[in-house]
Amino acid sequence: MDLNTIWFILISVLFVGFFFLEGFDYGVGILHPLLSKDDKKRRVTINTIGTFWDGNEVWVITAGGAMFAAFPHWYATLFSGFYIALMILLVGLIVRGVSFEFRSKDKSPRWRNLWDWMLFVGSAIPALLWGVAVANLIRGVPIDENMNYVGGFFNLLNPYALLGDRKSVV
């Protein structure tokens, strides 16, 4: 087995680990305002992921770093082509993290309801965009001879990718 294959397997394991662990967190965040009807039950659902939710992002950061180190052209093409989608994904993750922290800062029902819905949005958007990204990678993205992505953000939202985003949420 050559070094490229070993790196590819390592990066794949890191992404699979991230999606496996983070998928549970996304699911809790998406279902949180829909299934938990009172504040006590909502607190319990948040506590199921509260101790380790932020540690799961280490997997994707490590995968991105390994991709940058082992396959810089792949990294540059992927991140420049999916730049807008990844920035929206990042905003969703920030909203999600802030909602975990700010929800408990005030006991007002309106305040908590706001952050419960921010947790929903901050979990749904990244799950949807990860589905779009993975579906596009499986389908294939337009890359020119210089390894530059030649599509736009809305080219990523093709029917196959939109099916993939729904599958990632489910």
Which role does the model predict for each range below?
Residues 9-19, 23-26, 30, 58, ...:
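Hydrophobic alpha-helical transmembrane segments of multipass integral membrane proteins
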Residues 150-166:
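Short aromatic-rich membrane-water interface segments that cap or initiate transmembrane helices
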Residues 47, 148-151:
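Conserved catalytic-core motifs characterized by acidic clusters
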Residues 2-10, 42, 75-81, 108-117, ...:
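Membrane-interfacial loop-to-transmembrane-helix junctions in polytopic alpha-helical membrane proteins
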Residues 22, 145, 152-155:
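Intrinsic disorder/low-complexity signature
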Residues 52-123, 137, 141-144:
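Membrane-interface helix-loop-helix modules in multi-pass inner-membrane proteins
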Residues 169:
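Conserved small/polar residues in nucleotide/adenosyl-binding loops
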Residues 1-55, 61-64:
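N-terminal signal-anchor module of multipass membrane proteins
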